[in-house]
């Protein structure tokens, strides 16, 4: 400990370098944590339906009954919705959103779980209200209680108060009641979509084939397929993490190699004296390299704090339209970062131990 604080410049250089290594690791693992889990959350915790059905035109009462009669084929619950692309108008820019209007006689709770980013449940909007995806609201500076305007391709507008900002990771949605839509658009919503929950043990793909055979059905979309498609797109994050780990390893090697050489060069006489006193080579090496281990541990701890801020900065620079990230770092990622930093240190120390001591 005396030698560590005796050479203060080397102390700060070592801690700064190793903290940078640890911070890179936290950032790499944090990016993976923030990206890889969003697809699963979107299709298991937010959009909880299993199949989306799209009709060519507004459904008729007969078509509604036809879907409801599919219970023996595995349809547990279903709800009809109107889905329409509109522009959400902000003070400085507009963003494209998907407007979801539910059948007034239906309960949306089993199909879409509306909640805040902190997990607080949000009730489906009443007349004159809307619930908006948190990401698009943040981009436009919209807060709960604000009045916003939605505009379609025919320049017709809907003005509503924001009753809640819901967590959503894939695409941007605005949820609206049928009463609000009818009152302001002067027409009934076109219910051309249906959300379907399948019974336990039912193969969604087989049921989807059966639904596709119904009258006027244009498309059937399986949520599991969407989840797998987005997951494969996010698979490149593992490569990014590997690259960051290699960069962190390179940084650790450069810092430890150079500072260890400086340390030994400055203390040649001291090391020679220890050897003359009868210390074995391993004992002499441990005397020198023990300082590296202590400084590495201190640097790794400092890097955890630095890594949190670096991770937030990196995620703020990753902007993907229609996709929001769950910005967080899992506790196990901090453990991985410290362990890998110590492993890098051990490897470099083993590599340099004989070479450096012999040169001394």
What are these regions (language model features)?
Residues 11-96, 209-213, 219:
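Hydrophobic, regular-secondary-structure patches
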Residues 237, 283-287, 300-360:
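Short helix-loop junctions at transmembrane helix boundaries
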Residues 1-20, 30, 263, 289-290, ...:
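N-terminal Sec/SRP start-transfer signal
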Residues 14-24, 238-258, 295-303, 337, ...:
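Alpha-helical transmembrane segments of integral membrane proteins
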Residues 35-39, 208-253, 262-266, 287, ...:
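Peri-transmembrane interface segments
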Residues 41-42, 65-77, 81-147, 159-161, ...:
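Short beta-strand boundary microenvironments
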Residues 238, 252-294:
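Interfacial "coupling" helices/loops that link adjacent transmembrane helices in transporter permeases
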Residues 46, 124, 165-205, 224:
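Small-residue transmembrane helix packing/gating motifs
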